[in-house]
Swiss-Prot record:
The keyword Cell membrane does not apply. One of its GO terms (molecular function) is metal ion binding. The cytochrome bc1 complex contains 11 subunits: 3 respiratory subunits (MT-CYB, CYC1 and UQCRFS1), 2 core proteins (UQCRC1 and UQCRC2) and 6 low-molecular weight proteins (UQCRH/QCR6, UQCRB/QCR7, UQCRQ/QCR8, UQCR10/QCR9, UQCR11/QCR10 and a cleavage product of UQCRFS1). This cytochrome bc1 complex then forms a dimer. It comes from the Eukaryota. This is Cytochrome b. Its cofactor is heme b. It comes from Glaucomys volans. Binds 2 heme b groups non-covalently. The gene is MT-CYB.
Length: 379
């Protein structure tokens, strides 16, 4: 009798993806983040579904409904804080996953990489719309500021913004449509993640050396299923520590004040995971220029396969590129810090220098250093 795992049309797909999948024997813990992102997505969809059962997307009752969830619903506070902090864990895993891809040259898998960038945009859009739903001060003003950026688009800008708002300001119509989109997008993200995985399994995983590993493959189960389980446990430990001990650590106190269109908060800023892009946006004095820089700061990831000049795939054996990569990481930390600071001296200048450095490293220095390394190795 043949094994049902290998013959059943549906189980066979699962088998080829998670059980008998040949994986390189030398992949490190940096390869755990894909499965951790899948775990985060499931947590977000489940907690989000339970929150949606009690939430009302009306400007008059949205804030009260979130309060009701936290006070009156059984374990509502836990579900709400798991959902809010789950987004932070999601982005931590995302940034590490993308960073791994950049360091080890995983972007040479064009389709997998480009779908990954689309996924990043989709997750950012979902997180932004989710932040608007509690209808606190930062929700309202964040939505106003970010949607207003579209008015920088020549000719159609103002019309486009009013179309998105469903009126002449962020109001009931905006909240309702944001709730609808925030609900549907995670399922689109799940579908995209499956396509992401499909393309990855066409080529097989990359590995730290960047060399072809066809001669040295091991089955995913039990080796990497056990390794991923350890990753899950560490993630759950950090995640639940955050949720149960300091649930508001990464949030903004202003969001505990109900939205008031007549009172602007002193410092409007997004959640921490958008601060680097927000800093780039603010560092350009021109509105359209800032919006373009904001979009391009993420879209630039799609250029990495084109900008790859090295004869080697991974940075494992390229110390000069490694050095530049870690300067880029430090620069992103600097941008994140600047994004949360008020717009005044010296933060403006630091932000501008950090923004210029970000684009310079990616577009100019990394390709040049790669060419230099080729020369040094006489390739």
């Amino acid at each position: 009798m043949t094994n049902i795992r290998k013959t059943h049309p549906l189980i066979k797909i699962v088998n080829h993806s998670f059980i008998d999948l040949p994986x390189p024997s030398n992949i490190s813990a940096w390869w755990n983040f894909g499965s951790l992102l899948g775990f985060c997505l499931i947590v977000q969809i489940v907690t989000g579904l339970f929150l949606a059962m009690h939430y009302t997307s009306d400007t008059m009752t949205a804030f009260s409904s979130v309060t009701h969830i936290c006070r009156d619903v059984n374990y509502g506070w836990l579900i709400r804080y798991m959902h809010a902090n789950g987004a932070s864990m999601f982005f931590i895993c995302l940034f590490l996953h993308v960073g791994r891809g950049l360091y080890y040259g995983s972007y040479t898998y064009f389709e997998t990489w480009n779908i990954g960038v689309i996924l990043l945009f989709a997750v950012m859009a979902t997180a932004f719309m989710g932040y608007v739903l509690p209808w606190g001060q930062m929700s309202f003003w964040g939505a106003t500021v970010i949607t207003n950026l579209l008015s920088a688009i020549p000719y159609i800008g103002t019309t486009l913004v009013e179309w998105i708002w469903g009126g002449f300001s962020v109001d009931k119509a905006t909240l309702t449509r944001f709730f609808a989109f925030h609900f549907i997008l995670p399922f689109i993200i799940a579908a995209l993640a499956m396509i992401h995985l499909l393309f990855l399994h066409e080529t097989g995983s990359n590995n730290p050396s960047g060399l072809i590993s066809d001669s040295d493959k091991i089955p995913f189960h039990p080796y990497f299923s056990i390794k991923d389980t350890l990753g899950f446990l560490i993630l759950i430990l950090i995640f639940m520590t955050l949720v149960l001990f300091t649930p508001d650590l990464l949030g903004d106190p202003d969001n505990y004040t109900p939205a008031n269109p007549l009172n602007t908060p002193p410092h409007i800023k997004p959640e921490w995971y958008f601060l680097f892009a927000y800093a780039i946006l603010r560092s350009i004095p021109n509105k359209l220029g800032g919006v373009l820089a904001l979009v391009f700061s993420i879209l630039i990831l799609m250029l990495f396969p084109i900008l790859h000049m090295s004869k080697q795939r991974s940075m494992m054996f390229r110390p000069l590129s490694q050095c530049l990569f870690w300067i880029l990481v430090a620069d992103l930390f600097t941008l994140t810090w600047i994004g949360g600071q008020p717009v005044e001296h010296p933060f403006i200048t630091i932000g501008q220098v950090a923004s210029i450095l970000y684009f310079t490293i990616i577009l100019i220095l990394l390709p040049l250093i790669s060419l230099l390394e080729n020369k040094l190795l006489k390739w």
